[in-house]
Amino acid sequence: MRYIPHAYQAYCERQIVEKTALALWLDMGLGKTSITLSAVNELKFNRFEVQKVLVIAPKKVAEATWQAEAAKWDHTKHLRFSTVLGSLQKRIRAVNAPADLYVINRDNVKWLVDYFRNDWPFDMVVIDEASSFKSQQAQRWKALKSVRAHIRRIVELTGTPAPHSLLDLWPQVYLLDQGERLGR
C-alpha cells in the first residue's frame, strides 16, 4: 500500500531524521510506528546514517506489531526484522542474525546489555512505550543508561506519558539527553 502521511506525520518523521534524540508523544492510532519506520528507512537506506536499529517494546508488540506495520507499506516492506524473544538460544541466534531492525521485549533489555557489554552494536534505539522506562530504579533503565553513550540516535514513543509526578519524566528525559536538561 502506498504511504501518504498526514502533515503531522511527515513533520514527526522529519524530526526523527533531523534530531539524534527525540520523544514522540502521540495518542494511540496516530501512526507512531509507521512514522518511525519511515524515518528508519530514510536514515538507513537514503542517508546511510544508521546500520542496526533496536526496538524495545512490550512483549505482545515485539512479537508482531512492528513487522506487520512494515509489511503494510510499499516503502518499508523490504525492511528485515529479527525478533529477539524466547529461550536464551533463540535470543542469541536472533540477535546475531542479519537484519535491519531487532525487536526485543523490555524485560530482556538487561540481558541484551550484558550480552554485548562494551561491544554495543545498535546505533539507533527506539523505545516503544517509553513510559515503561520511568523508573530509574528498574534494571531495564539502569541497563540502557549504561550503554546510552554508545547509542547515536534514540527515539522514545508513547501515547501515554502519564507521570504520577514530574519525577516520572526525569528518567525518560535522561535517556534522551543524558542529564543535559534536567540534571544527573
Language-model segment annotations:
Residues 28-29, 151-166, 174:
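Conserved helicase ATPase motor motifs in RecA-like P-loop NTPase domains
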